[in-house]
């Protein structure tokens, strides 16, 4: 009996299957420091204990994307070790803040399977839940990923595609129990813009660009114990037409989110992921730019508002003219990410 694990192929998954993922991870200040080094986020709520305490929290929580990447990384050996690409996200909810010292674990349920027409790959839909050391769920999300089949001849007897919500409803958003923005310090946060200053339909060019190098993306992906072959195995990737390793999509998400500080300085706290699509593969060396559109707004009380934001990232193309889809629905060739999320922002009133 082999003691090594080749990972699951598409035909190994079953609808309703539950996968408990190995290697619990205790979050440390070192994780926060490395996250800052890789992406350069500047949101005050995650940077300063004193700022966070003034907002009613016991200390600075980690950026929600840190928790997301850790939980995502736990799931990779069971779900996407043999992936072609991660395709998208939906129904993501951040249920509780995560602090250094918390230990995160993850498990996933297979909620959909769809074999592709080439019979060489299929799409696996999973709902992944991350819990802390107290057994409390801290985040939950759906993702779907294209996975290779071990054998093209393998039959897939039961297939189904889940019916997923277009967006998380504002009434379902969860803010940390003690969060209170009534004494929010806009000067220390870096900008005066509050909930009232953003209008539905408004578009914001985040101006700045950031290149991602080969070593950076590999280290950033290893930080989360993400083992997907497409990010690391250059020997195998040399057989692909691109001949290159794919950059983990989460690297693009976090880079674009860090860039969004310029224009959304007070919208760092992600509450939900409504949807997301990696529009085209990203390879290291290109410069990432980003722009955002305000899709909706909601008053959550306690001086807290929420903005529903569409964040679009591009490769090697500034976003002053907001590149996205054309009149036929086709994306601009430079677009690499289309990401829809809710973020908390302070209210003045």
Report each predicted region and the residues it spans.
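A cross-kingdom feature marking solvent-exposed beta-strand/loop segments within repeated
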Residues: 85-96, 110-112, 269-280, 295
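Hydrophobic alpha-helical segments
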Residues: 266, 279, 285, 316-317
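Hot-dog-fold acyl-thioester-processing enzymes
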Residues: 1-87, 149-273, 329-338, 344-349
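HotDog/MaoC-like acyl-thioester-processing domains
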Residues: 1, 5-15, 96-178, 284, ...
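Short, structured motif recognition centered on aromatic/hydrophobic residues
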Residues: 35, 89, 104-108, 124-128, ...
């Amino acid at each position: 009996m082999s003691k090594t694990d080749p990972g699951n192929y598409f035909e190994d998954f079953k609808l309703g299957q539950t996968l408990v993922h190995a290697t619990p991870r205790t979050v440390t200040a070192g994780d926060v420091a490395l996250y800052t080094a890789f992406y350069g986020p500047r949101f005050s709520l995650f940077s300063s204990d004193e700022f966070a305490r003034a907002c009613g929290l016991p200390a600075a929580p980690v950026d929600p994307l840190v928790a997301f990447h850790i939980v995502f990384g736990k799931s990779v050996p069971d779900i996407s070790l043999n992936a072609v690409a991660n395709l998208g996200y939906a129904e993501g909810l951040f249920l509780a803040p995560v602090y250094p010292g918390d230990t995160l674990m993850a498990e996933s349920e297979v909620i959909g399977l769809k074999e592709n027409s080439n019979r060489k790959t299929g799409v696996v839909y999973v709902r992944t839940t991350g819990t802390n050391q107290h057994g409390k769920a801290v985040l939950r999300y759906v993702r779907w990923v294209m996975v290779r089949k071990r054998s093209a001849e393998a039959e897939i007897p039961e297939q189904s595609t889940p019916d997923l919500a277009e967006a998380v409803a504002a009434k379902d958003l969860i803010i940390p129990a003690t969060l209170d923005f009534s004494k929010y310090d806009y000067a220390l946060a870096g900008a005066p813009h509050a909930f009232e200053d953003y209008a539905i339909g408004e578009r914001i060019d985040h101006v700045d660009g950031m290149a991602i190098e080969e070593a950076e993306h590999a280290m950033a992906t290893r930080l989360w114990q993400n083992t997907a072959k497409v990010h690391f195995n250059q020997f195998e990737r040399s057989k692909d037409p691109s001949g290159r390793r794919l950059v983990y999509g989460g690297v693009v998400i976090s880079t674009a989110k860090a860039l969004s500080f310029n224009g959304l300085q007070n919208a760092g706290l992600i509450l939900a992921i409504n949807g997301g699509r990696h529009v085209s593969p990203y390879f290291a060396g290109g410069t990432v730019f980003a722009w955002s559109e305000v899709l909706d707004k909601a008053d959550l009380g306690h001086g807290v508002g929420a903005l529903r934001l569409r964040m679009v990232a591009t490769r090697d193309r500034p976003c002053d003219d907001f590149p996205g889809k054309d009149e036929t629905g086709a994306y601009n060739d430079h677009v690499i990410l289309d990401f829809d999320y809710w973020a908390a922002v302070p209210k003045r009133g």
